[in-house]
């Protein structure tokens, strides 16, 4: 097996890693290190921090965020399908209908379980 043909790929990967790592290391080594309490405090538009930055959030915010990402990805999968609708034919149309049916059933399940209720 001739591995010489992979040398440009290896070189490309090494140069890419070096371009990312070398500035980080140089900044860490050569940069000034003068810690100060004001630098370590959170910044809130020029005001003193009102509350602890590590306050707890209700888990429903995370659930809504996950559901948003899920249905946002659904739209991202639908755009290429819509562009190539004429080329994929009936088989592609049926596949997308199955995909949408699964997502609608999942959404209905989340709604029925009360995941979207804020009371």
From Swiss-Prot:
GO molecular function, one term: NADH dehydrogenase (ubiquinone) activity
TM spans (from-to): 9-29, 63-83, 88-108
Keyword field: Cell inner membrane, Cell membrane, Membrane, NAD, Quinone, Translocase, Transmembrane, Transmembrane helix, Transport, Ubiquinone
Gene: nuoA
Entry's localization field: Cell inner membrane
Catalytic activity: a quinone + NADH + 5 H(+)(in) = a quinol + NAD(+) + 4 H(+)(out)
InterPro entries: NAD(P)H_OxRDtase_bac/plastid, NADH_UbQ/plastoQ_OxRdtase_su3, NDAH_ubi_oxred_su3_sf
Uppermost EC category: translocase
UniProt subunit comment: NDH-1 is composed of 14 different subunits. Subunits NuoA, H, J, K, L, M, N constitute the membrane sector of the complex.
Family: Belongs to the complex I subunit 3 family.
A cellular component annotation (GO) from this entry: NADH dehydrogenase complex
Record's protein name: NADH-quinone oxidoreductase subunit A
Role according to the record: NDH-1 shuttles electrons from NADH, via FMN and iron-sulfur (Fe-S) centers, to quinones in the respiratory chain. The immediate electron acceptor for the enzyme in this species is believed to be ubiquinone. Couples the redox reaction to proton translocation (for every two electrons transferred, four hydrogen ions are translocated across the cytoplasmic membrane), and thus conserves the redox energy in a proton gradient.
EC number(s) stated in the UniProt entry for this protein: 7.1.1.-
Lineage of the organism: Bacteria, Pseudomonadati, Pseudomonadota, Betaproteobacteria, Burkholderiales
Predominant location category: membrane
Membrane-topology annotation of the record: Multi-pass membrane protein
